[in-house]
Regions:
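Single conserved hydrophobic/aromatic residue that forms the stacking wall/gate
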Residues: 2-13, 249
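Exposed aromatic-hydrophobic patches
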Residues: 14-18
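Extracellular Ig-like/FN3 beta-sandwich strand-entry sites
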Residues: 21-23
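Active-site acid/base region of carbohydrate-active enzymes
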Residues: 25, 33-67, 73, 80-132, ...
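Conserved, well-structured interaction surfaces
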Residues: 141-142
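Conserved, charged catalytic cores of large soluble enzymes
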Residues: 218-232
């Protein structure tokens, strides 16, 4: 809601609301006698361009791709978000999906937003080594363990590196990533990860969710990413530590 100040009789008044609003309809409530000369809106968003394309012989699929690209765009501002109407915070479960989509739809300037999110996630690592999102945070600190594994793993951090070719963030965050996967997370005698509930043990929507299977899958994908980073940084001992766990027990 934006309320304009009153003006004198007969004045021509121009006003631009500086607040960022979104929605499906704009309602104007005007005093009697006010004549509207013009109504406009100014689109704002993240500094990127729609450079990707998709085309097939099915008009529905072409329209779906176009709308999907727009949906991705409106979830970008100071950070990736779930949606601007309900959740503008940087939920990393959403960001994993969105950063991967950006490579197909948007210009390279979009890469910076994902890297910013990577730094923020790791910079908010807690004293016990655990990670949580959304970050930056002031009223939230609940870890969703499986979402954090997805974030730091193959479809999160590694996808950002692989498709962008930008490895500058890897040496900055690697030690904290290693601590999370090998101190915060533990494996049992057979080499399988021990389930962690965190503060919110969410595996998927619905019922009959096999958290054991999901934990193993996401932990494996996180180790797979870490091993690639370790080899890139010349951390041979770390890579050798990862190999028997990820490739003997989890495959």
């Amino acid at each position: 809601r934006d309320v304009a100040p009153s003006r004198g009789l007969g004045d021509v008044y121009k006003r631009q609301s500086l607040g960022w609003m979104n929605g499906h309809e704009m309602l104007y409530i005007l005093p009697e006698g006010v004549k509207v000369l013009d109504v406009k809106f100014r689109e704002t968003g993240y500094n990127t361009e729609f450079t990707g394309s998709f085309s097939c012989n099915d008009p529905f699929m072409n329209e779906l791709w176009k709308r999907s690209a727009r949906t991705l765009y409106i979830t970008m501002r100071d950070n990736y978000m779930d949606c601007p109407e309900r959740e503008r915070a940087q939920w990393w479960g959403d960001e994993v999906n969105e950063l991967g989509e950006a490579f197909y739809a948007l210009s390279p300037s979009s890469h910076k937003l994902a890297v910013k999110g990577i730094y923020e996630l790791m910079n908010w690592q807690r004293a016990d080594g655990s990670l949580f999102a959304p970050v930056p945070a002031g009223n939230w600190s609940k870890e969703l363990p499986l979402q954090m594994l997805a974030s730091v793993g193959w479809y999160g951090f590694y996808t950002q590196y692989y498709y962008s070719g930008d490895s500058t963030f890897i040496p900055v965050i690697y030690d904290r990533l290693h601590r999370y996967l090998h101190e915060t997370w533990q494996v049992d005698k057979s080499g399988l990860p021990i389930e962690r509930s965190g503060e919110w043990s969410w595996g998927d929507w619905g019922e009959q969710i096999d958290m054991g299977v999901l934990t193993n899958c996401w932990y494996y994908l996180a180790l797979k990413a870490e091993k690639e980073f370790a080899l890139q940084l010349g951390k041979k001992a770390d890579a050798e530590e990862i190999t028997p766990v990820s490739y003997t027990h989890l495959t």
